[in-house]
């Protein structure tokens, strides 16, 4: 029904008319950087992921004291970035580049293609309509 109405699938859980994609979320799914300001907010910059204190009063008290309101952080290593690029990239209609897959992931992609869950595109892979319904399982296979 959405396709018939002129909408296109551009992300596992999102459809839009041409040009109407949510640029904010595309930044996340494409591995971009973002600021997180406020209680419970998350941020990502140059491979460093951090998150703020969740409780609004505790966050405000830290800010009032001139303290960093971060509750924690982690540096995303190369393997983590690779896995995230698979997980987030497969959510998108543009799919993933084949070079993010290791040998086991490449074999899993060929198997998923034979199962009708992935389709090859020049230099990479895209979920089929059936694959979108099984996206988490496909990602787990491709992680190797």
Could you describe each region identified by the protein language model?
Residues 130-144:
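Short, amphipathic alpha-helical interaction segments positioned at domain boundaries
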Residues 1-102:
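C-terminal scaffold of the Radical SAM
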Residues 109-110:
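Short, hydrophobic-biased segments on the C-terminal half of alpha helices
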Residues 104-106:
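Flexible, acidic glycine-rich loops studded with aromatic residues
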């Amino acid at each position: 029904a959405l396709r018939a109405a002129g909408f296109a699938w551009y992300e596992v859980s999102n459809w839009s008319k041409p040009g109407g994609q949510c640029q904010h979320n595309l930044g996340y799914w494409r591995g971009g950087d973002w600021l997180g300001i406020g209680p419970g907010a998350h941020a990502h910059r140059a491979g460093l992921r951090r998150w703020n204190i969740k409780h609004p009063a505790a966050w405000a008290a830290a800010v009032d004291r001139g303290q960093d309101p971060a509750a924690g952080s982690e540096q995303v290593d190369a393997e983590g970035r690779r896995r995230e690029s698979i997980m987030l990239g497969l959510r998108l209609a543009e799919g993933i580049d084949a070079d993010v897959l290791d040998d086991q992931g490449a074999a899993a992609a060929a198997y998923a293609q034979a199962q009708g869950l992935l389709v090859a595109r020049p230099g990479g892979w895209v979920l089929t309509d059936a694959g979108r319904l099984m996206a988490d399982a496909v990602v787990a296979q491709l992680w190797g």
